[in-house]
Amino acid sequence: MQRYFAHKRCCAMTAEVLADAGVQPTGNRLASWDLYIPSYGGGFSTEIADLLPSRSDQWVAGIPGSWRLTNKQMLWIGLCAAYGRQRAAQLSPESWWLEAARDRAALVEQHREGSHYILKNPILQRRTGLRLTQDLSVLLAGPEQGYTLAQRLLPELMLLHRHRFNLRLYLLLTRQDGRLEFWLHRRGRCVCAPAPFSGDLMDAEAVISRSVGSDVLADGLPFSLSEAVHHLPRPQITLARLDTVLCRVLMACRPGLQSAWCLSSNPAYQLLGVDVTISNTGGVRIIEMNAGPDLRPHCSRDHALKYRIVRDLFEHISLLPQTRPSGFRRLDVRAP
């Protein structure tokens, strides 16, 4: 790879990896680039559809239809359509689309006193787009404040040194020669809530995880995926369940991903961040997925991890020379 085109919002980590490899940016989207990085957002599918690549080996950093995974409402709707609501709730926390009359009616019917929920705003990122509540009236008024999804808060999650946590994984989607494939990186993060959990599901500091540097983690809390695995009572069984759950989620969305592609001759990839929870009994659920995941490092360890993931990505798809075995492993995702 010699040149790439990217919008100003290009991930800084991606730009750093490419600069270190001697790959030059170009401001001309009509130039003979080797990689095109779109502006991720609501219109990126249209942007890709309007591309006119001059060569069939030009890569595109975006897969139209990936919103079926990264849009929180659409992910839940896709799971329900593929498996039914009860089975879908075994793969991801039960959710209600607050802008849909049918889901609002179901929420009113299913709500019980003492139930806890987390409201999600699709526009605001990280903790600013989240709100904890037990109040049905707050749930129903959610869309007025931009909250479009209510997700059941899971009470019986595994704790690490009394802290709730989730695992942050990195999933690579590739489409080449008509094949859509899914690859999971062997490295990841353990993201913990700042405060110990005392049982109060309305305590945001103890319930909502926050990605921080290793230097400010509470004593004993793991930073990386590999460190977190050592705390699991049956790590191999839990990791196998993780693969199974992730594959089933991807199975449900694969048909839409297949049909949405608009550049038949050009290869494409997309990196997603996947947030996962583990229950006290070892059950695994996918909380959400994020497109163009936030790769801003929080410390030197975080920088090294994210730098390697991005470098491995480009080596995996042969845009950069391979310097070590790939950090990505293929997931066996078939039609549901």
What do these predicted regions represent?
Residues 3-116, 123-125, 135:
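Conserved N-proximal alpha/beta basic substrate-recognition cap immediately N-terminal to
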